[in-house]
Amino acid sequence: AAILIVSVGDRDYKTEEGELRTMPGIKNLVRYQQNLAADEAVAFWNMFEAMGGEGSMADMVHAKPSLANYDYTHINFRGGKHLAGLLYESLIYGKEQYDRRRAYYEEEP
């Protein structure tokens, strides 16, 4: 069975000055998940980067229409549909690249 590890997404918090920032530890967790996937030879999809990276949760909350909730932690249905589309495109692209490499190696004498 194939396994895909999907990283944690962005999660923001308000600083004492009222600014929104990516929570400490999110980037380290994503790196840990990516290394774990590599160590176990399973697929990895970086949802944090797919969302737009650091500070992207705030962008999703304030998008019109909104793609995430005002807790700056959870995506909503529209955000889920958007990210699902990005994941689908990534999987299709990966399959196309795999098929091209496979066809290339099958052509060699």
Task: Kindly label every feature range from the protein language model.
Residues 10-109:
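Catalytic His-Asp segment of secreted/periplasmic serine-dependent ester chemistry enzymes
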Residues 1-11:
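Conserved, well-ordered alpha-helix/loop/beta-strand core segments that scaffold catalytic motifs
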